[in-house]
Amino acid sequence: MPAAIRPMKKTVSFSKDVSNNNNNLESDSDTKQSPQSYLTFIPQIKNSLLVVPFHNIFILVGMFYSGLTQDLETVMWKGFLTSIPIQVIYNYIIYINLLPLKKSTRNDHQNNSSGSAINNNNNNNNNNVPLLIGSSIFVSIVLSLPLFVVIILMGAPVYKYSLKTLYLSLHLSQLIFNPLIILSNLNVNKIKRLFKQDHLYRIIFHHGILSSVLLTLGGCWLGVIPIPLDWDRPWQQWPITLLVGGYLGGVVGGVLSLIVNYFSH
């Protein structure tokens, strides 16, 4: 008689699947940003009240007092020159109000897209402060040229208005790029990493500098609205309302950050 064929026992192993799932979970957790990973590359502010750009109001009032609506180009240029030493003082106030960076975790180092971890030991004491502040002014002036091109591409009038638009870009570059350069310590990768964070707007409005910069852009954008209205007022000239919106937007952004931080605590 032929030998009876014994049925084979079927076994199912989940060990490989479980191990694969565990590996996938670990990789997913590595790719996710930690809740406060931005603290490892964006310095926080000691006293948010001190970095609110209230000086913007005085610069703006000074330009109107000097005849901004009568001699627009001359007053805008003189106002820009006047704002530079004021901005130098403001940059120093920002610098001395920056807290040391939080130490990076393993995941924060892995998520650094540039492939190099940020050295948190390079605190404020290791910086050449005059060089940093001077560089922020110079770089901001240089960046006013691409900003000028962007404003033109977004619909700014060109014929007979190019010089006024250039002066507008000079003012806006000081309001936008100057504080960001001090905050990032001339490291563009820090700003790039900021846009990869979850809850970006929550981070921005909890930070006095970032909130001021964002509302400067928003105020300038809203400043376009009164220009085409049929009111025939001298202050409706291009680009006075954009200039006013940018300067006041920075102040509103700083105050808004104070309010957000107050209620969040």
Swiss-Prot record:
It is found in: Endoplasmic reticulum membrane. Pfam families: PIG-F. GO terms for cellular component: endoplasmic reticulum membrane. Keywords: Endoplasmic reticulum, Glycoprotein, GPI-anchor biosynthesis, Membrane, Transmembrane, Transmembrane helix. The keyword Amino-acid biosynthesis does not apply. Glycans are attached at residues 111-112. GO terms for biological process: filamentous growth; GPI anchor biosynthetic process. It is a multi-pass membrane protein. The chain crosses the membrane at residues 49-69, 79-99, 137-157, 166-186, 209-229, 240-260. Pathway: Glycolipid biosynthesis; glycosylphosphatidylinositol-anchor biosynthesis. Belongs to the PIGF family. Acts in the GPI biosynthetic pathway between GlcNAc-PI synthesis and GPI transfer to protein. This is Glycosylphosphatidylinositol anchor biosynthesis protein 11. It comes from Candida albicans (strain SC5314 / ATCC MYA-2876).
